[in-house]
Amino acid sequence: MHNDPTDTAFLHQAIELAVQNAAAGQLPFGALIVRDGEVLGMGVNRELDEHDPTAHAEVDAIRNACRALSTRDLTGAVLVSSCEPCALCHVTAAVAGISRVVYAAPKELAMAILGPGDDGSNLLTDMQQALRALVPGQVEHVPTDGDGRPFERFAERGRP
């Protein structure tokens, strides 16, 4: 694994998207799709607004990048997420050709602040572990200052 010096700057952007989403009463997750130092797409978790369990921030960012570029192929791009992506997001990134994923907050931090989810998160965690075994080194945790801010903001507002 390697840590690109620009990872931290983009991770801070993803964290800020997540903080803004939490302040708006939505789930506290944000993501970017980046290639060659350019942001191709941004996304936030829209599950509550859209009543859609697949509307994760990472999937939203991938959809927006694909739409902006009129393609389904994001080869060479990096998924930058405010929090450790679940299996759904990992698979979506792989299908889009994204070869590298970096994230700020580990899922354990999110669960410590938000509590365990009621959304099948155990299933997603099991699937996540299986995926990582298939493609070792693709997903990288980059410790980032402020990675807990989105969850703290969400907890301050209370669950919707």
Where are these regions (language model features)?
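Helix-adjacent hinge/juxtasegments
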Residues: 63-96, 100
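Small-residue (primarily alanine) positions within well-ordered alpha-helices
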Residues: 14, 18-21, 31, 57, ...
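A short helix-loop-beta-strand connector motif used in the catalytic cores of GNAT acetyltransferases and
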Residues: 23-26
